[in-house]
From Swiss-Prot:
Protein name: Argininosuccinate synthase
Catalytic activity: L-citrulline + L-aspartate + ATP = 2-(N(omega)-L-arginino)succinate + AMP + diphosphate + H(+)
Alphabetized PROSITE patterns for the sequence: ARGININOSUCCIN_SYN_1, ARGININOSUCCIN_SYN_2
Family of this protein: Belongs to the argininosuccinate synthase family. Type 1 subfamily.
Enzyme Commission number, as recorded: 6.3.4.5
Source species of the chain: Parafrankia sp. (strain EAN1pec)
Keyword ATP-binding listed: yes
Underlying gene: argG
Length: 400
């Protein structure tokens, strides 16, 4: 029986060439799988047909936008997920859902292996292959770009030689990845960490230095998940899409950072994530209003670790599942509305309210109606500072 390989297919040069490359190198039949996670751009039916033209025996397109939002973006919002306190895991979140569908397709079509188009310098190779190890350890993984020396020049020559329907005349200077949660750009002039990113690299966001009227949004949350915008109940997909448009129009969500990659190198990355930054800003602020202090403090460490393991390709790990259990529990009661002003590239919280607010005006006010008994403070300070006082007395005794 002829071997079958399921290829993570984007419709671009590398994965289109990989269809024929895999067939020529291994004799296997290739099943192309494109997963729609809200990346936009080219029509997915055109991509599906291109795979057939390039030699695939089967071509599948999966609309996974709702699943991506509900099962991957939503947990990231609850976990305030920002790798290195800045990057909202745009690509990191999309890889495990692609792996999930690759494995399902492999089982359905009797495939022996899956394939991806990742290089050996990036994080995605780890995310794909460790994900496969977790879900289907018996499947082999083929990585033609990394393992077979399939350079861009060789890929172009391969495509031209076989007349593949791929336009390679307009080579973008950037490597782009995008989905519902944001857009990433690297390579080209961006590899110089001193060089200012040219404006043509940005697509999701307007220039934040240009003066324009501000916008204001009110985001509603239920148990830590966004459920409405400006009083309208919306699905998470629609809510994120609208915020990408409105916050992006105000230049919100541009990130220029030096990132520590999993493989050990530093890279310069440009991200555009207007909805992600707006939602994470609002969610964290609502947590400050509703979470008990020790839970909030502990959760910050959990959130950081959650972002790290997802970035590192361990979505399917038992640790992430365990962290999710804490995050889900802590999120109960994180319900309310957050009002955000969008202007000049900044999403600024200007108001928040919650039926479960722990803010007590009668305790916080310095005006009439203050119910905080300030005479309690002296005894509290004496007890709170007692360990420090005892330690200081010992130090003075031993080191007069």
């Amino acid at each position: 029986m002829t071997e079958r390989v399921v290829l993570a297919y984007s419709g671009g040069l590398d994965t289109s060439v990989a269809i024929g490359w895999i067939g020529a190198e291994t004799g296997a039949e290739v099943i192309a799988l494109a997963v729609d996670v809200g990346q936009g751009g080219e029509d997915l039916e055109a991509i599906r047909q291109r795979a057939f033209t390039c030699g695939a025996v089967e071509s599948i397109v999966v609309d996974a936008r709702e699943e991506f939002a509900a099962s991957f973006v939503a947990p990231a919002i609850r976990a305030n997920a920002l790798y290195m306190d800045r990057y909202p895991l745009i690509s990191s979140l999309s890889r495990p859902i692609i792996v999930k569908h690759l494995v399902e397709a492999a089982k359905q079509h009797g495939a022996d292996a899956i394939s991806h188009g990742c290089t050996g310098k990036g994080n995605d190779q780890v995310r794909f292959e460790v994900g496969v190890m977790a879900l289907a350890p018996g499947l082999r993984v083929l990585a033609p770009v990394r393992d077979s020396g399939m350079t861009r020049d060789k890929a172009i020559a391969f495509a031209e030689e076989r007349g593949l329907p791929i336009d390679v005349s307009k080579k973008s200077p950037y490597s782009i990845d995008q989905n519902l949660w944001g857009r990433t750009a690297e390579c080209g002039v961006l590899e110089d960490p001193w060089a200012q990113p040219p404006e043509d690299v940005f697509v999701y966001t307007a220039d934040p230095t240009v003066s324009r009227p501000s916008d204001e949004v009110t985001i509603s949350f239920t148990d830590g998940l966004p459920t409405g915008l400006d009083g309208r109940a919306l699905s998470l997909v629609d809510l994120v899409a609208e915020l990408n448009t409105r916050a992006g129009a105000q230049g919100v969500g541009r990130i220029d950072m030096i990132e520590d990659r999993l493989v050990g190198i530093k890279s310069r990355e440009i991200y555009e994530c207007p909805a992600a930054i707006t939602l994470l800003t609002a969610h964290r602020d609502l947590e400050d209003l509703t979470l008990e202090r020790d839970v909030a403090r502990f959760k910050r460490g959990i959130d950081q670790r959650w972002g790290e393991i997802v970035y590192d390709g361990l979505w399917f790990s038992p640790l992430r599942a365990a962290l999710d259990a804490f995050v889900d529990s802590a999120s109960v009661g994180v319900t309310g509305d957050v009002r955000i002003r969008l202007a000049g590239g900044v999403a600024q919280v200007v108001g928040r309210r919650s039926p479960g607010s722990l803010y007590d005006h009668a305790l916080a006010t310095y005006d009439a109606g203050d119910q905080f008994d300030q005479t309690d403070a002296r005894g509290f300070i004496e007890l709170w500072g007692l360990p420090t006082k005892v330690w200081a007395a010992r130090e003075q005794r031993l080191n007069p």
